[in-house]
Design a protein with these regions (language model features):
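Short glycine-rich or small-residue beta-strand-to-loop segments that form or flank ligand, phosphate
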Residues: 11-13
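Short, internal active-site loops enriched in acidic
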Residues: 17-18, 48, 176-181
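C-terminal accessory regions of radical SAM enzymes
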Residues: 153-187
Length: 187
């Protein structure tokens, strides 16, 4: 990172960083947040959804002290936004950490406008910004979860007609050769 002064945003992922103990998480955060060139240290974690007890007030306060941490989490259906999950997200928000959600569009799970709208509203009530809805990657063994592009576009249009502003995420695909997230409307 030192050799690349144009890098302003660092993503800590590669699995889930919150499976590590607090001191290890903070070692990474401090290493990046301490660099003057870095504006944002993003933590990508499913912990608020799958292990909300992990996101304690103490951990949130430590993360918030850097002033640079943002959290990207992943919820795929409204039922995952439990009171415990909302409390975990609230701990982060109260510590001054912006929280956003990256959802995966999954056949048979959330592939309807109604399911997506319920999720987006549940996230907003938990003070989490719905940010991206990803087209499921073409990974071996999960083809049955992939939603056809035309269906994804229909869901996006139906959602856009019924919710707006911060409640409407971008529907995108993460293409292997692309240098950015590609809106599904362009595919």
């Amino acid at each position: 990172v030192h050799d690349h002064p144009l890098v302003r945003d660092v993503l800590i992922s590669g699995g889930d960083p919150l499976v590590l103990p607090d001191d290890e998480v903070m070692r990474f955060v401090r290493a990046f947040a301490g660099l003057a060139q870095i504006d944002v240290v993003r933590l990508c974690t499913r912990a608020p959804c799958v292990n909300p007890a992990r996101v304690t007030r103490e951990l949130a306060a430590m993360l918030g002290r850097s002033g640079k941490v943002w959290v990207n989490t992943q919820f795929n259906c409204a039922g995952e936004v439990t009171p415990e999950a909302a409390e975990a997200c609230g701990n982060l928000v109260r510590a001054g950490i912006p929280v956003s959600c990256q959802t995966v569009l999954l056949a048979g799970v959330n592939d309807s406008a109604e399911a997506m709208l319920a999720l987006f509203r549940a996230l907003q009530r938990a003070r989490v910004r719905p940010y991206y809805v990803f087209q499921c990657d073409p990974v071996a063994g999960i083809a049955h979860f992939r939603v056809p592009l035309e269906r994804a576009r229909q869901i996006e249009r139906a959602c856009a007609a019924r919710i707006g502003g911060l409640g409407l995420p971008r529907f995108v695909a993460d293409l292997p050769d692309a240098d950015r997230k590609t809106p599904i409307s362009e595919l």
